[in-house]
Structure formats: C-alpha cells, structure tokens
Regions:
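Mobile cap/lid helix-loop segments that gate and shape the active-site cleft of serine hydrolases
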Residues: 59-67, 82, 120-162, 166, ...
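Short glycine-enriched nucleophile-adjacent loop
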Residues: 80, 107-118
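Short beta-strand/loop motif that positions the catalytic acidic residue
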Residues: 164, 171-173
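C-terminal catalytic histidine-bearing segment of alpha/beta-hydrolase fold enzymes
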Residues: 193-235
Length: 235
C-alpha cells in the first residue's frame, strides 16, 4: 500500500508500520485487518478511492450492530480471539508468550483483547488510554468502534486496563494528542493511575510502564525495543 501517496503519508505521520518494525526486531507478527478497516472496509459506502484506504466504515457496522445488542469493539475482540486460536492450531510458533501491540484503534483492540483473554501475556497500548468523559463524550468525531452503550456510567478505560494486571503492560501517551481532550495528558495519567492501583494490589507495580511521548497522536518507536526486552524478562 505504500505505493499510494495518501497511505505513505499516513504511515510516515503516524508510524503505522509498527508491524514491520516488530518483524525487523525478530518477532513473528500477525497484522489482521479489523472489521471496517483495510480490505474489510465496506466499499459500497466508501468506493475505492485512494484517500479512503485508511478510513473506516465502522459507523455502518455500529449502526447495524448496536440495535442487535452488539458492538464493533466486541466483534473486533472476538476476531482477535479467533486469531489466537489460529496461531495455536497452526502449531508453527510458540504461543505461551503471546503479546499484543496496537496504536489508536489498534490500542483499543489491544486493551479489550488483553483484558478479556489471558492468553495475551504482555501488551502495548499506544494512543488509547483516555477517560471516556473527556475523550468520547465531550469530543465529537471519534470512530464508532469506540462506543459501548452505557459503559461510561459504570466503568472507565482504566478499569478495563486493570484486568490486564499483573501481566506486563506498556502504555504510550502523547503530550499533544488531541484525543486526550480539553485537560490534556492529565486525562491519560488519571486512567493509568487506576491501572497502577491494580498492579500494586498484585505486588507487580514494576510490570506497568507509562511512557510520556512528545507530539500529537502517533505511535513512538523510541524505547520500544528496550521496553519489550524488559517486559519479556518479566514473563
């Protein structure tokens, strides 16, 4: 896809090529297209224009799913669980040390998958650790994959992240990420503190790493290699 100008520009801006980056570090990497993304977009709505390649059709999925008691986040999590099943049944790779890394919408999927499937032994969530009130309810224009009806009344992003404890977890937050909301990175810090309390209960506070990064909404490769090695030693 990098032959297309709009895609190449986005890869450069957001560092979207983190799958390739991990492969070059020696990891076996599976990079599935999520529902409504990439080859799983609904072309009937978007057509096949280059500038649409990295946009989603999650709105149309959510529009049909939510009246049926389903969510895009739930469907994506189910897909990723089936991907782990595939990796296990294939029998080609070790699956006792599985990790999951995602940025933005991929961070959302990593959050839910790691929280709900303990086969994920370590996780990296980049660009997705926000208090729902600031980031989803006060901001308009977020992707429909983010929304779980009524969830904000009872739980926040940090509560979901707490379910990952005591497994190694790295969270990246960017200081100027517009999705932090009006209070900036303090919104992310509050959610990480909720998670940190869970790690303290397990006596595993060293297994939670919170990396503050400069700039806007993007994945940061700086320090990833060293942090992954550190996290592997904790397994």
């Amino acid at each position: 896809l990098s032959q297309y100008g709009a895609v190449a520009d986005a890869i450069k801006k957001f560092n979207y090529d983190y799958g390739l980056f991990l492969a070059r570090l020696g990891y076996v990497v599976l990079c599935p297209d999520a529902r409504g993304i990439g080859e799983r977009r609904d072309e009937a709505f978007q057509k096949d224009e280059e500038e649409m390649f990295l946009r989603s059709t999650c709105f149309y999925l959510a529009h049909m799913a939510e009246p049926l008691g389903m969510t895009v986040a739930g469907m994506c999590t189910w897909d990723l669980m089936r991907l782990i099943d595939y990796a296990e049944e294939r029998g080609q790779w070790r699956t006792d040390n599985l990790g999951c890394l995602g940025f933005s919408g991929g961070g959302m999927q990593t959050l839910w998958l790691a929280a709900l499937d303990d086969r994920v032994k370590m996780a990296v969530i980049s660009g997705y650790m926000y208090g729902y009130k600031d980031a989803l309810l006060k901001l308009n224009g977020n992707c429909s994959c983010n929304y779980v009806p009524g969830l904000w009344k009872y739980y926040d992003c940090g509560d979901i992240g707490s379910l990952i404890a005591p497994r190694p977890l790295l969270i990246q937050s960017c200081a100027e990420d517009h999705l932090n909301g009006e209070r900036g990175i303090a919104n992310a810090d509050e959610q990480v503190e909720i998670i940190r309390q869970a790690y303290r209960l397990f006596g595993a506070k060293n297994k939670l790493i919170h990396q503050h990064c400069p700039g806007g909404h993007q994945f940061h490769k700086e320090g990833i290699k060293e942090n992954l090695e550190r996290m592997e030693e904790m397994l």
